[in-house]
């Protein structure tokens, strides 16, 4: 798993090193569709977990990923989420929904319930 998280741009096939290409596919032979897509799904779940009316951000962030950002991730309920984190804590969140709905957002140990309006971006900053 540790080598799986190593970013690589290698184009040749090699049985050593492993890693991940920019498109999130595995950099090792043979091509395994379950491993490639399964890994992308696992990374998504580490960053955001959602169910109807609830979104949890950074539930399982690796220690090595202290700072980062995500753009355009989909949560259940057709909610698009962008967020940034610093030192492992959420700094900024943007949400946009295709329809009106109530959703509880949990991050940094805080839960907030908000009402989303169709195609209107909602911003939250945590400092």
Residue ranges and their predicted role:
Residues 1-127:
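Non-catalytic C-terminal accessory modules of carbohydrate-active enzymes
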């Amino acid at each position: 798993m540790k080598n799986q998280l190593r970013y690589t741009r290698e184009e040749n096939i090699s049985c050593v090193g492993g890693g991940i290409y920019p498109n999130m596919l595995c950099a090792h032979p043979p091509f395994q569709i379950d491993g490639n897509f399964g890994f992308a799904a696992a990374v998504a779940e580490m960053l955001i977990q959602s169910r109807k009316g609830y979104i949890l951000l950074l539930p399982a962030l690796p220690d090595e990923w202290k700072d980062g950002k995500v753009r355009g991730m989909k949560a259940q309920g057709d909610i698009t989420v962008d967020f940034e984190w610093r030192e492992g804590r959420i700094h900024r969140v943007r949400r946009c929904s295709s329809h009106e709905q109530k959703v509880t957002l949990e991050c940094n140990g805080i839960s907030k319930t908000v009402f989303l309006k169709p195609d209107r971006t909602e911003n939250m900053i945590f400092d």
